UniProtKB/Swiss-Prot annotation:
InterPro entries: SecG (IPR004692)
One GO molecular-function entry: protein-transporting ATPase activity
Gene Ontology biological-process annotations: intracellular protein transmembrane transport; protein secretion; protein transport by the Sec complex
Protein name: Protein-export membrane protein SecG
General function of this protein: Involved in protein export. Participates in an early event of protein translocation.
Keywords assigned by UniProt, alphabetized: Cell membrane, Membrane, Protein transport, Translocation, Transmembrane, Transmembrane helix, Transport
Length: 198
């Protein structure tokens, strides 16, 4: 049945292609997709014989596609698992006799039971909590050099002492071991190198 429907499907597809190619174009590129010629009963009246034949063949194509899908699914819709044989004589997972190892049984071996006995009142704590410290421990505050300079300026203004402010050279932190102080010669060499690259 499916082979006959498949053959009919191929014939219908070829006929639809031939009928569509034989039709005369109604719009011929003018006003495409927006004119009245694109409607079913265009400006020239009802559709011609070829247009009706195209619609009929298209309807047959859709019906044949649905029928082909239904019969194909009915014929070949069986699962592979339906045809497999099951072995009904399976060995039992637990031996019928009581030959279990008693050391693996948690009721016979209390060391295998990790859970302790539940307390009679689970809302009551078993231990008393330790007292909390009265004051939190104070941590030392380390200021950055810039913040330290600002604080010194503010203190000097508050005390009304003039001339206490440090100049920028004294306020700078000394360079660390991984920082090299730049000299005038190194900066000039760097700018000369950029000029040479240009």
């Amino acid at each position: 049945m499916t082979s006959a429907l498949l053959g009919l499907q191929i014939v219908l597809a070829v006929l639809i292609v031939v009928v569509v190619l034989l039709q005369k174009s109604s719009s011929i590129g003018l006003g495409a997709y927006s004119g009245s010629n694109d409607s079913l009963f265009g400006a020239k009246g009802p559709a011609s014989f070829m247009a009706k034949l195209t619609m009929f063949l298209g309807l047959l194509f859709v019906i044949n596609t649905i029928a082909l899908g239904y019969f194909y699914n009915k014929e070949y819709g069986k699962s592979v698992l339906d045809e497999t044989k099951t072995n009904k004589e399976l060995s039992p997972l637990v031996p019928a006799t009581g030959t279990l190892n008693p050391t693996l049984n948690p009721t016979l071996n209390p060391t295998l039971n990790p859970l302790e006995q539940a307390p009679t009142n689970p809302l009551m704590p078993t231990q008393t909590p330790k007292e909390l410290p009265k004051e939190p421990a104070k941590t030392p505050f380390v200021e950055s050099p810039k913040q330290n300079e600002k604080n010194e300026k503010n203190d000097a203004k508050e005390n009304g002492i003039k001339g206490v402010e440090k100049n920028k050279e004294n306020a700078k932190t000394p360079p660390t071991t991984h920082q090299k102080p730049k000299t005038h010669a190194t900066t000039n060499a760097h700018t000369n190198q950029k000029k040479d690259e240009k």
